[in-house]
Amino acid sequence: MLDKRAQILLKTLIEHYISDGQPVGSRKLSVASGLDLSPASIRNIMSELEDHGFIASPHTSAGRIPTQRGYRLFVDTLLTVQPLQNQEIRKLENVLSSPDPQELINKAAELLSSLTHFAGLVMIPKRQGAAFRHLEFLPLSEKRILVIIVTTDGAVQNRIILAEKPYSASDLTQASNFFNQHYAGNTLDEVKQKLHEELKQMQSDMTRLMAAALEASSKTADNKDGVVIAGKRNLLDVQDLSTNVSSLRKLFEMFEHRTSLMQLLDQSQKASGVQIFIGGESGYLPLDECSMVTAPYETNGQTIGTLGVIGPTRMAYERVIPIVDITAKLLSNALSNNH
């Protein structure tokens, strides 16, 4: 563990580097840190910090810059977070006000982007968390069937399935009535589990039809468009990112395809609060030059998604962390109130 003087110098160095992006020299540190140390003592501590991998020397400068490890120690133990003022929180509450859940999610992403000037993202809740209210089968042709699924959060899904055999309109009405009578109020996961058990016991046409409907619904829940991203273009204005065209291209490809982004957000959903991935910690190459700050959001006590911000590793963590945290809480409140 670093002693108090080394911690103060590291904190001062990182705060200055985040502020202006310039390598920090020992002379500036001796003035800014408030420590009564000789330049030689400061250089010795800087060498110690460099040996431990917390700072590094760019080839073009005599100053030092923080490494990924340095940022991690800073965020975990040295950072002083700046809480949002009540007036700011009230403004955010007014923005996150809508009876439409999808509009709330879009607004939350835009809010994160506008407040941080980075990319804001909100994972769209998967349908697994919502309970079924109503299901209807409608014949389109001999084997093509339109499935209409309505969930308790007001979402409506229309899916076309290809049945193994022809069904009459009366068969489909009977199947719809049976499903609504036995499964209304259950979540998608619960219904899938029950149908799985029933399929093991009896291979009935009705059970197979319902299983096909659920499979079609599940595919939608896991699609690549399951995240709203706002402010991607902000990252083009971030000097730390825009100078590396190759890395920036990979990052935008990640935004386009979204599968790995969804996996990372899914992983963050298991956290109890704000989670921070610095540089390569995420395990995804396009984010090696970035930091990602995330927080789960919920409705009525149940976690249903994750939101966050993607920006450079040189970001004002003391400001971004509370913005992500309060946005997650306000989105949770707004979604719960809608229910």
Swiss-Prot record:
Pfam families: HrcA. Keywords: Repressor, Stress response, Transcription, Transcription regulation. One of its GO terms (molecular function) is DNA binding. InterPro entries: GAF-like_dom_sf, HrcA, HrcA_C, WH-like_DNA-bd_sf, WH_DNA-bd_sf, WHTH_transcript_rep_HrcA_IDD. Coiled coil: none annotated. GO terms for biological process: negative regulation of DNA-templated transcription. Negative regulator of class I heat shock genes (grpE-dnaK-dnaJ and groELS operons). Prevents heat-shock induction of these operons. Belongs to the HrcA family. This is Heat-inducible transcription repressor HrcA. It comes from Methylobacillus flagellatus (strain ATCC 51484 / DSM 6875 / VKM B-1610 / KT). The lineage of its organism: Bacteria, Pseudomonadati, Pseudomonadota, Betaproteobacteria, Nitrosomonadales. The gene is hrcA.
